[in-house]
A protein has these predicted regions:
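Active-site segment of metal-dependent pyrophosphate-handling enzymes
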Residues: 7-11, 22-25, 59-101
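Generic beta-strand structural signal
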Residues: 1-5, 14-17
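Terminal peptide-recognition signature
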Residues: 4, 54, 92
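Conserved Nudix-box catalytic region and its N-terminal flanking loop in Nudix hydrolases
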Residues: 13-56, 60, 69-72, 160-164
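Nudix hydrolase/Nudix homology domain
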Residues: 24, 30-32, 85, 89-91, ...
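A short glycine-/small-residue-rich loop at the edge of a beta-strand within enzyme catalytic domains
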Residues: 37-45, 79, 83, 111
Length: 164
């Protein structure tokens, strides 16, 4: 599916925008997720799905192309409820260039948060992020903020995300 990091830079500090998932969802309730994300249906392009999900998840009526960056396409495997799953994430980044009041339209999101990089690490430590949301965030860091990781860590993450 598509996963879109919402981000902005203010006074040389990066901030990420997250959607807190509804407590009523069966999978990963109350966890923080990428600003926009959703499965890829057949019959529409990945970019059209990004626009659809941006509206449904965050009430973004029009994504401005000049603020969108295509990240990597990442294959991954995970275990959930004693089952193994595979997936593909089409990573996008959306620079939040002005103040936006995000509004969920499909009932899957409880609220939205803007979080500094330092607080992002706290969410990771406390396991408050939806597991596959971490993949697109790591991709963003590798492409834009690699100075936050030790060189050995960068090599390990790149090796994990490599699609061989």
């Amino acid at each position: 599916g598509v996963h879109c990091n919402g981000w902005k830079k203010k006074s040389d500090e990066f901030y990420f925008f997250f959607a807190k998932r509804s407590k009523h969802l069966n999978d990963f309730p109350n966890l923080y997720d990428n600003l926009v994300g959703g499965g890829q249906p057949s019959g529409i392009s990945i970019y059209e799905n990004l626009k659809k999900e941006a509206f449904e998840e965050a009430g973004i009526f029009q994504l401005k192309k000049k603020y969108i960056t295509k990240g990597n396409t990442i294959n991954y495997f995970h275990n959930h409820k004693n089952f193994a799953f595979s997936g593909i994430i089409f990573v996008y980044d959306y620079e939040i260039y002005k103040d936006i009041n995000f509004k969920n339209m499909d009932g899957e999101v409880e609220s939205f948060y803007c979080i500094s990089v330092d607080k992002l690490f706290t969410l990771l430590e406390k396991k408050k992020l939806k597991p596959n949301a971490i993949i697109s965030i790591a991709d963003f860091f590798l492409r834009n903020l690699s100075e936050y990781f030790p060189k050995k860590g960068i090599l390990e993450i790149k090796n994990i995300l490599k699609n061989d």
